[in-house]
């Protein structure tokens, strides 16, 4: 199989549509023939790349890194040449389907390689090495060697500011060796993007949303302005509670928050410090962590429970191969990429997840989220190859998050027997606080990661100022500062997986808006009359049919058309976030009276 795929690649690199060689204006028929050939060749090659990547992610060695780099390098070269050829059909009066495929072909690669010998292989080597350096990162603390998982546990559980600072700095130190590779990667990726007609890689990324690149940047600004006041309200309250806990010497009552005090390595979700910021005079009658343990859940049962949710809304159970081939727990005998992800290895039925699952509420949610990717992948499996994707990358993230909103409700926990009785309305504020500490706290981080990369790719920020620019944006959007002065050669962006892993991040910001819009629409469809945060769509098969109809469209239509199939709306509307959290935002406004909010 491998030799056949490589042979097909060699043919593909030499055999483009004849119109290009003739120099005459291509015809619509030639454009369609070109697209058909490109799809066939890319589909044939995709399985080889996917399986090489899976092996490397689940068994990190020099050999598997070499294999993945070779496969992705060959794919990058193939796609880059096809993408450049696609540009030659600009202006040809093709049918709408062919036109969309030509556009998607030019946008296929996250980071296209320059069209010159050796460039694709070099880019693939850099991206594989950065990912592996991050994934195998370790540091010393109190005579012990700590992994990211170890460090995350300490940040979640410790309330010793000195320990938090030391562990935070320890993990961030692993990113320093990544910087030289990132500098080279950014330059190569930009060269490739410019070869396809984009100003830089950032402009290429922003062109993936069925609108002009600059219009998309403005759209994310619009959405951020809709939710920013709520974030600032939450920030103000949390900062006050941290000040009560630690005092002025650690966390002042005004200004930004120290990033290591929020229970998460990147301060992107703050739910782990709920014990510090819990609304006074309120109680939570249950802990999802404790419920899972008490009911005898293990990682496999958690995934089975996630599957059951999707089955309850009418989706076909996962294939047997999913259970045989997925990595559900962390192996003890080798290095793996623990970052949770969902995989489609053959564009048909070989779907899998890769997780180092722990029995806790966070991973209970993550399971429902990752399975959302798998069910989306399977829903669009009958689409042509270039349409086998989400309506946009934010949709792909939002599908599982939408299900996750139901999965965390006491309504659902009672439906599946984890909770004997749903709590009363007096527990709504603590429930919404827990949700906001994860969902609302995330929003500015979801925005700023790519804001930083856009500045890097555009040349606005040069390598000497990478770290300074990173913290300038973290202060601007999140109101956060590091726990101490950062070394001049630090590369703190590299301590977040998606930077060395080369995964665009604005998708997560969008997903955190879309999921509430989907949730509100679904709850209206099922006739839910209560507060949005109590609504569960578990068991709602009619709603599931409408939902799956959107998923089956893949990337075949612009995302507004696909969104309308399920929600009836063609624009992104963050008012659903406000609707969901309205009781908490009103409560926070009262609590913050007299505080000097902002930073």
Task: Annotate each predicted stretch with a short phrase.
Residues 1-4:
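Positively charged n-region of N-terminal signal peptides that target proteins for export
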Residues 7-17:
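Bacterial N-terminal signal peptides
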Residues 22-184, 202, 496, 503-506, ...:
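N-terminal helix-rich structural modules
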Residues 23-30, 64, 200-203, 269-284, ...:
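C-terminal, non-catalytic "cap/extension" segments appended to globular domains
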Residues 145-148, 157, 184-354, 424-432, ...:
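Active-site-proximal, well-structured secondary-structure segments within enzyme catalytic domains
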Residues 162-169, 333-360, 367, 371-378:
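Active-site scaffold of zinc-dependent metalloenzymes
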Residues 202-203, 207, 377-403:
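Post-HEXXH active-site segment of zinc metalloproteases
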Residues 216, 220-230, 390-427:
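Post-HExxH zinc-binding segment in Zn-dependent metallohydrolases
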